[in-house]
């Protein structure tokens, strides 16, 4: 048997800082079948199991039984299994939304066995992600309005959570995207279909590989919402070989599916982009490492995230805050905004992501009441309310507890009195800022910069990255001519002539100002 050496590994991050390509470009022609076989072999080399004979829905369901029995250390009789499938796993009334909700929120079912004992049956182990069994199958055939045969399916505990559609190199990747759409209409969502559990689609033509969420929302269901995987410096990972070695690492894929995705209250599945995951991971890593080193309440125990406007900072900050609340040693997580309207807006957005995960307040007294609650909810507040609380309440129990602060738009409004009070009152805090416009020494009006207040930059995704990824609109620049008689003076090189003439004759001439203002 061949020896395979690790080519991508990180104990902290799934979005890698470094990745070394260790394969040669094939000299010969590669058919779609060759591409598929090579892809599956690469997955097997990475620890995926490749069971034979799983080519029908009945075989798929039988495999789910084997995997769930192993995961839960339980044995179903044939009658019990039939009842479990019909009443919960694959209820006839379940649609794609109900199945997805089971993956995200309702993944534990209290099942009553025939002898009367009750056991929690887990679909997925979210605490110990490595316990989930990952398998790869190919060419499964399923009938709906038409019979379809799917290229490659990734099973987690037997459930089809990822569907991969491949086209040979040179074929437009949109063809794979269109094929996935056709399957969604024709057979994925047919009655009694475990494919309603699908979370993520991956499409590739060998040279370009992308992933996207399985959603029925029409406004989220276009090619524009497909994403490349990337390294931490936002270098795109496109080739299927590289994509397989990074995105399809078992730990990475399971974390994307089970940790870095959100099924919101409007039944829209959001799968995070690489830069959002990278930022979230680095915040959590910083909190952990600062706690272990006891370097809380210092610049070393914090940092800032430079993500451009429109890149989805709200989802990133929510995930960072939500996962921080799950750390055993963290008592409270604050999300701090600088305007009252943003306070309400963020509350609504966070409640959309997860209805029971957040506490808001409409006053300083309300904020104090929320601090007294013994729950792990995120507290959303304005900097003004937080500052008023710190000024009016010099001695609160929260001041001595382990607290994470995440500041939205960490610009100059957070550099003043509130920062001083925070550092004076809170004894064990970790603070992080999100910004689209960081303040550096060369554009600082005062002594403070973003780094001097929050700590070093932990991750960046700037406007040029977003334009390249087509996640924000390009700049539109118009060069407009004003009246020609005023143009000559603007190119005058003689400073004496220019200073004498510019005000009266050209730049402040009423006709010129009128031309510009009326444009």
What are these regions (language model features)?
Residues 168-171, 207-210, 340-342, 384-387, ...:
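Conserved nucleotide-binding/hydrolysis micro-motifs of P-loop NTPases
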Residues 444-519:
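Interdomain helical connector at the RecA1-RecA2 junction of SF1/SF2 helicase-like NTPases
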Residues 378-421:
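Conserved RecA-like ASCE ATPase "motif II neighborhood" in helicase/translocase motors
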């Amino acid at each position: 048997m061949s020896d395979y050496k690790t080519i991508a590994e990180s104990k902290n991050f799934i979005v890698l800082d470094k990745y070394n390509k260790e394969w040669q470009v094939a000299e010969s022609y590669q058919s779609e079948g060759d591409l598929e076989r090579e892809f599956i072999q690469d997955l097997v080399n990475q620890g995926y199991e490749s069971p034979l004979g799983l080519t029908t829905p009945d075989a798929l369901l039988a495999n789910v039984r084997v995997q769930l029995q192993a995961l839960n250390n339980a044995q179903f009789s044939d009658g019990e299994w039939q009842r479990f499938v019909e009443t919960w796993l694959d209820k006839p009334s379940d649609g794609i939304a109900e199945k997805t909700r089971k993956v995200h929120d309702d993944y534990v079912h209290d099942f009553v066995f025939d002898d009367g004992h009750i056991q929690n049956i887990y679909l997925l182990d979210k605490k110990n992600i490595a316990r989930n069994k990952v398998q790869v199958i190919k060419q499964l055939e399923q009938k709906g309005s038409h019979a379809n045969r799917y290229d490659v399916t990734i099973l987690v505990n037997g459930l089809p959570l990822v569907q991969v559609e491949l086209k040979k190199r040179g074929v437009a990747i949109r063809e794979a995207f269109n094929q996935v759409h056709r399957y969604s209409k024709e057979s994925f969502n047919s009655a009694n279909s475990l494919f309603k559990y699908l979370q993520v689609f991956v499409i590739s033509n060998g040279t370009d590989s992308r992933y996207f969420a399985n959603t029925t929302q029409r406004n989220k269901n276009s090619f524009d919402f497909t994403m490349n995987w990337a390294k931490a410096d936002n270098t795109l990972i496109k080739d299927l070989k590289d994509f397989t070695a990074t995105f399809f690492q078992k730990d990475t894929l399971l974390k994307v599916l089970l940790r870095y995705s959100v099924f919101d209250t409007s039944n829209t599945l959001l799968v995070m982009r690489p830069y959002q995951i990278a930022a979230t991971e680095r915040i959590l890593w910083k909190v952990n490492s600062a706690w272990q080193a006891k370097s809380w309440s210092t610049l070393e125990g914090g940092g800032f995230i430079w993500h451009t406007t429109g890149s989805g900072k709200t989802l990133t900050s929510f995930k960072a805050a939500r996962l921080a609340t799950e750390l055993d040693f963290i008592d409270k997580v604050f999300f701090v905004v600088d305007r009252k309207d943003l306070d309400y807006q963020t509350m609504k957005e966070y409640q959309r992501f997860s209805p029971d995960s957040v506490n808001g307040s409409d006053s300083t007294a309300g904020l104090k009441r929320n601090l007294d609650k013994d729950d792990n909810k995120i507290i959303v507040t304005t900097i003004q309310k937080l500052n008023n609380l710190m000024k009016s309440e010099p001695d609160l129990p929260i001041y001595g507890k382990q607290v994470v602060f995440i500041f939205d738009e960490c610009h100059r409004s957070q550099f003043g009195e509130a920062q001083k009070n925070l550092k004076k009152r809170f004894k064990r805090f970790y603070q992080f800022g999100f910004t689209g416009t960081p303040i550096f020494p060369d554009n600082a009006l005062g002594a403070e910069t973003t780094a001097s207040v929050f700590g070093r930059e932990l991750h960046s995704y700037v406007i040029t990255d977003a334009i390249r990824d087509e996640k924000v609109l390009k700049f539109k620049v118009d060069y407009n001519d004003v009246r020609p008689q005023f143009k000559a003076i603007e190119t005058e090189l003689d400073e004496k002539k220019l200073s004498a003439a510019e005000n009266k004759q050209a730049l402040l001439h009423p006709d010129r100002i009128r031309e510009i203002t009326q444009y």
